[in-house]
């Protein structure tokens, strides 16, 4: 019996051992270790954003936990290790502390995000957000993620935002107590000491700020007292526009240039003490400015040498470059104002003239401009506007005016405007136009002149976005172009705006050669000009490729993206500069290479706005063969100077009116989207002022031309004549007929196919005809009126 019991107990022991071993084998399942390793690998990929999977994991955690996701990574790794080796879920005090710390960090991240941005996080689906984050390769600041967002959204209505801040502090303290083995009193003592130290530093900073504010106030008060003292020392300027009153039936309100003129002259009178060369103290200031300019020149020479070693990756920012000051422009001279009594008298004459012809109307307002005076007439009920317009010549006769322009009706008002030339045109300087608007945040802001009311008119080129300037010889077109270029030089640095100047007349724009804003030297050869426009088209297409790869829509968005990347990355990438292309005489280009120029202008005007490329085209021959329908339709902004006929005016601005302008800078401006014209007296700019601005710019930085943008040298046709005796006859025949083909030469000269083909090749090589384009006829590149013909 005893032996049997021993055997049974032995069997029980062996079976129990087998059971425990089998349990151990089951518990030691290798799948658990594989899962743990996989979790660790995924967490490492997410932390360092390695590859596609790493970015997706980090996007997911960023969306859920926001900035607190880094603590989540650590907690997941620790929990994985604990569960793997202890084979149970951790239920300790530190586990609770970690969870409380995670919740506290969610609150902290979301509160920081809320106070910084002042906006709420968007409630996007998780998968769509993760996909967008991966697709754009960026991880935006999302505060406390979706969990933090909903925690804050639920808590604020219950306990207010201030209560949430208190709860967050308590959660942080509780997590520290749970995670550490210190007693509560010790933790509270340390916390109180830290709070006291923080309040002490905060009070010190506030006291320092109050002291700085007090010093600034005292400095402002001192400057105001000095300005008052200077004004008291200054002699009073007598008003030369004191008018003797003429007895009238009633007083008509008069506005405009006389008031603006007095303002613009009272302001510079204070500056005269600073900038006049007559005062000895100002000579010292000028010497000091000259010394500073010499130092700037030395610094910029060094910077230019360093720029030349850099490849054509982009324009290097010259930190020491300073835009030219407005003091380089001449101060506007004081001029005799238009007599108000004379203006009142003409207003009464105008009313009487209209009454004599059966038109009952009253002059309600008079605006005195630099060149013309506008009489605003309000016709009585039932009077047709066309009746006033038909009295155009009678009104001019009654007022003894050269010509009058009638604006019927004035846009946005129930009145008719009659513009009568002044006896003497008041000169408008570019300095007084730019004084109120410069420096401008828009680097393409240019000054045009003053309108009828005497208000300065400045327009941004990037809103035009392209401009057509046309007018007869001597009307002020070239002065307007110089004013636009000078405005850009006064407002933009070389790395911000680039210029390409095309001047077939070879005399107007050569003064700008050597300025650092130029992409290439001023182009004077018409053949090179066509190639230069094609280079601009290629640059436009290159920029659109950059926009496509960077997922941006225009130059503004691309430059903002580059600025953000430059802040985050060590490698600095250059921003794209704006490019302004100015063609001073379009007619000369259309005679030499009409089709190429027209096609290039069409591409630029249709697509280049988003790429930051803007075109200004000027011509003194506003005919339909120069300003073609394609060019006109794609250039929305236009300036019309004085022209000889109403047909030319309609070619430029679509309506008549430019034939009645006075010349000497008198213009009609039609902006992009405007339904009416604005009459402007253009700003005058002397050659010496242009030269002073150019010298100031060139002394700081030399031109750094882009070789890729330079057009190829024109082919020397004297060296590329044909050996065939019939070449000259074929040349004249093709130019006269303005068409060319092998079969046409065969029939005309009764020659074989081979000889006719060789003649066609010679004509193409000498740039008489264009290349073959499939079944289309070849284009003849030489005009019949060409000097060579």
From Swiss-Prot:
Comp. bias (Basic and acidic residues): 209-231, 247-262
Subcellular location(s) per record: Cell membrane
Topological category with respect to the lipid bilayer: Multi-pass membrane protein
Cytoplasmic side: 179-789
InterPro entries from the UniProt entry: AAA+_ATPase, FtsK/SpoIIIE/SftA, FtsK_alpha, FtsK_dom, Ftsk_gamma, P-loop_NTPase, WH-like_DNA-bd_sf, WH_DNA-bd_sf
SUPFAM superfamilies hit by this protein: P-loop containing nucleoside triphosphate hydrolases (SSF52540), Winged helix' DNA-binding domain (SSF46785)
An example Gene Ontology biological process: chromosome segregation
Pfam families: FtsK_alpha (PF17854), FtsK_gamma (PF09397), FtsK_SpoIIIE (PF01580)
Subunit structure: Homohexamer. Forms a ring that surrounds DNA.
Protein family: Belongs to the FtsK/SpoIIIE/SftA family.
Protein name per Swiss-Prot or TrEMBL: DNA translocase FtsK
């Amino acid at each position: 019996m005893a032996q049997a019991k021993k055997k049974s107990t032995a069997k029980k022991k062996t079976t129990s051992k087998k059971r425990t071993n089998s349990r151990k084998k089951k518990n030691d399942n290798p799948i658990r270790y594989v899962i743990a390793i996989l979790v660790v690998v995924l967490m490492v990929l997410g932390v360092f954003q390695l590859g596609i999977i790493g970015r997706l994991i980090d996007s997911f955690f960023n969306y859920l936990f926001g900035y607190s996701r880094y603590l989540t990574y650590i907690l997941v790794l620790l929990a994985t290790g604990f569960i793997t080796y202890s084979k149970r879920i951790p239920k300790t005090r530190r586990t609770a502390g970690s969870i409380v710390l995670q919740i506290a960090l969610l609150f902290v991240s979301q509160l920081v995000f809320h106070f910084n941005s002042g906006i709420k996080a968007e409630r996007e689906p998780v998968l769509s957000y993760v996909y967008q984050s991966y697709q754009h390769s960026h991880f935006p600041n999302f505060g406390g993620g979706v969990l933090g967002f909903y925690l804050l959204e639920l808590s604020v209505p219950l306990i207010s935002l201030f209560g949430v801040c208190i709860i967050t502090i308590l959660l942080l303290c509780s997590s520290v107590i749970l995670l550490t083995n210190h007693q509560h009193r010790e933790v509270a003592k340390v916390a109180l000491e830290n709070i006291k130290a923080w309040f002490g530093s905060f009070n010190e900073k506030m006291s320092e700020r109050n002291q700085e504010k007090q010093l600034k106030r005292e400095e402002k008060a001192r400057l105001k007292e000095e300005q008052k003292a200077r004004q008291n020392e200054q002699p009073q300027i007598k008003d030369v526009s004191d008018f003797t009153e003429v007895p009238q039936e009633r007083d008509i309100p008069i506005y405009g240039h006389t008031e603006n003129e007095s303002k613009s002259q009272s302001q510079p009178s204070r500056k005269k003490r600073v900038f006049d060369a007559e005062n000895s103290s100002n000579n010292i200031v000028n010497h000091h400015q000259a010394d500073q300019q010499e130092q700037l020149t030395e610094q910029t020479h060094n910077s230019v040498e360093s720029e030349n070693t850099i490849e054509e990756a982009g324009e290097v920012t010259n930190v020491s470059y300073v835009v030219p000051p407005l003091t380089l422009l001449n101060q506007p001279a004081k001029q005799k104002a238009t007599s108000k009594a004379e203006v009142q008298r003409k207003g009464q004459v105008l009313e009487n003239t209209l009454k004599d012809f059966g038109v009952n109307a009253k002059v309600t307002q008079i605006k005195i401009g630099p060149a013309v005076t506008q009489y605003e007439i309000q016709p009585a009920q039932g009077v047709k506007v066309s009746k006033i317009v038909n009295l155009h010549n009678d009104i001019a006769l009654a007022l003894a005016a050269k010509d009058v322009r009638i604006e019927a009706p004035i846009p946005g008002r129930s009145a008719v405007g009659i513009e009568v030339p002044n006896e003497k045109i008041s000169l408008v300087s570019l300095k007084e136009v730019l004084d109120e608007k410069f420096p401008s945040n828009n680097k393409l802001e240019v000054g045009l002149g003053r309108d009828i009311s005497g208000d300065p008119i400045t327009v941004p080129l990037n809103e035009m976005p392209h401009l057509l300037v046309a007018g007869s010889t001597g009307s002020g077109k070239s002065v307007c172009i110089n004013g636009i270029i000078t405005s850009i030089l006064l407002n933009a640095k070389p790395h911000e705006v680039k210029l390409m100047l095309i001047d077939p007349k070879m005399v107007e724009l050569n003064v700008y050669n050597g300025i650092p804003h130029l992409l290439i030297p001023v182009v004077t050869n018409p053949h090179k000009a066509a190639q230069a426009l094609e280079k601009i088209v290629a640059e436009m297409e290159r920029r659109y490729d950059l926009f496509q790869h960077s997922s941006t829509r225009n130059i503004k968005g691309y430059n903002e993206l580059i600025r953000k990347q430059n802040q985050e990355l060590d490698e600095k990438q250059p921003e794209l500069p704006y490019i302004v292309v100015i063609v001073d005489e379009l007619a000369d280009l259309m005679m030499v290479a009409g089709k190429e120029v027209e096609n290039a202008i069409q591409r630029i005007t249709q697509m280049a706005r988003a790429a930051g490329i803007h075109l200004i085209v000027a011509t003194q021959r506003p005919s339909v063969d120069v300003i073609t329908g394609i060019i006109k339709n794609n250039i929305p902004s236009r300036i019309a100077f004085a022209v000889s006929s109403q047909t030319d005016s309609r070619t430029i601005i679509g309506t008549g009116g430019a034939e009645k302008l006075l010349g000497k800078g008198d213009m009609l401006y039609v902006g992009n989207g405007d339904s009416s014209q604005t009459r402007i007296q253009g700003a005058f700019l002397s050659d010496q002022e242009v030269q002073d601005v150019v010298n100031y710019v060139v002394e700081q930085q030399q031109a750094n031309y882009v070789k890729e943008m330079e057009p190829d040298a024109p082919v020397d046709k004297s060296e590329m004549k044909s050996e065939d005796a019939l070449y000259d006859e074929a040349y004249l025949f093709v130019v006269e007929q303005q068409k060319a083909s092998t079969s046409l030469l065969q029939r005309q000269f009764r020659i074989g196919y081979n000889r006719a083909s060789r003649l066609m090749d010679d004509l193409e090589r000498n740039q008489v005809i264009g290349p073959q384009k499939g079944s289309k006829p070849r284009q003849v590149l030489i005009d019949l009126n060409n000097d060579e013909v």
